[in-house]
Amino acid sequence: LPIRVAQFLHVVRGNPLKVARIHLGCVKCREIPKLLPHFHVSLQSGSESVLRRMGRRYTREKLCRLFRRIREMVPDAVLRTTVILGFPGETDQDFQQMLDFAEEIRFDHLGVFVYSDADDLASHRMRLHVPAGVAQDRYDQLMSAQMDIAAEKNQRRIGQTLQVLIEEDLGSSLFAGRTCFQAPEVDGVTYVSTASHAVPVAIGCFAQARINDAMEYDLIGEVA
């Protein structure tokens, strides 16, 4: 949609540090009024050693400083990242650093992927490939930690009234939609009930919903 008619804009791709800094400047200065304070910084790993093996040009410390700066300058910022577990050479210590990083930063949204090998990848020729079972166990541990973080953050939204883009009629006066901080396909949804209100709700339109319950990734509310 053109900026003049879009309700809000997400930035979801780009060089992690460069794009995030530009994005932060635009949000802080309100250069693009509809640009959301939602920062997708692709972390890849919270281990300095793994980042080097991946050939990344940024460090764990630079990422930490960036996230702290975002939170200081934009208190209501939403932080999103993606990481890869089981990259060749990743040790238990490397994974613990990643787990500690996630606990410290407390991302609003965290996408976790297990390394998938292929003959044409440069990493295919690296030593010390991580056994699939070990990588999966690390995935389970990190996702469990993130689930607790996400649940805590969602609990804080109970009592708030949020704008929700209605996307699906589930029947029985229940609709599913997304708030501005819930990206399509990858995040949770917000369920909106109209049972106790005669307020019309339409697919593709926005509705105000008061949040009265929360799950790990989804919110539950009623039209306000």
Say what each PLM segment does.
Residues R125-A224:
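Terminal RNA-binding accessory module
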Residues P2, V12, P16, A118, ...:
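Generic signature of intrinsically disordered, low-complexity, basic-rich segments
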Residues F39-V41, L110, V164, I211:
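OB-fold and OB-like beta-barrel modules that bind single-stranded nucleic acids
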Residues R4-F8, A20, E31, F39, ...:
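Terminal low-complexity, poorly structured segments
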Residues L1-G25:
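Long, compositionally biased, helix-prone stretches
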